[in-house]
Amino acid sequence: MGSRPTPGLQRTTSAEYRLPSTRPPASVPSTAPGGPVVGRGPTGGPQAPKAKWSALGADGVQRDQLWRELLEAERRSQQRWAQNWSFLKDYDPMGNKKEPVKLPDHVPRFSDTVPNSTNRAVGSRVDTPLGKTLIGLDFFFVEGARKKKLEEELQPI
């Protein structure tokens, strides 16, 4: 709880500004001249998985940069899909052109078949068979939350 730093986490200011990293950004290859060789231990062999994760956890800025690059690549690929493949939405799986769905000219604001309801108060169409069914379903749905009289053996003395 004190002000001791946690190992593996970078210190941040109150504005969530991360301190500058000493490592190269994610876009720079790790085998750049003068840069560390990632994935190799002191003897040149592969690092243990625990050491690999601790190395990743120590540099949040690099992970953040990598995440931003991945998001940008995803956005670009979505735009390319719209340019290259969006024509497929006009065809069915057999390759036939789909007919566009004709929307009605006028749609009434209130339904004739479904009762209007707001805040558990069913609207003006309660006398319809569907409205009566909904009231019955609502009655059984909230049954567990209702106060009930205790059975005789559970009554206080």
Swiss-Prot record:
Stored InterPro entries: C20orf85-like
Any one GO CC term of this protein is: cilium
Provide the alphabetized UniProt keywords.
Answer: Cell projection
Where do the record's region annotations for Disordered lie? 1-57, 92-124
| Pfam families assigned to the protein according to its UniProt record, in alphabetical order | LLC1
PANTHER family per record: CHROMOSOME 20 ORF85 FAMILY MEMBER, RIKEN CDNA 2410004P03 GENE
**Protein name per UniProt:** Ciliary microtubule inner protein 5
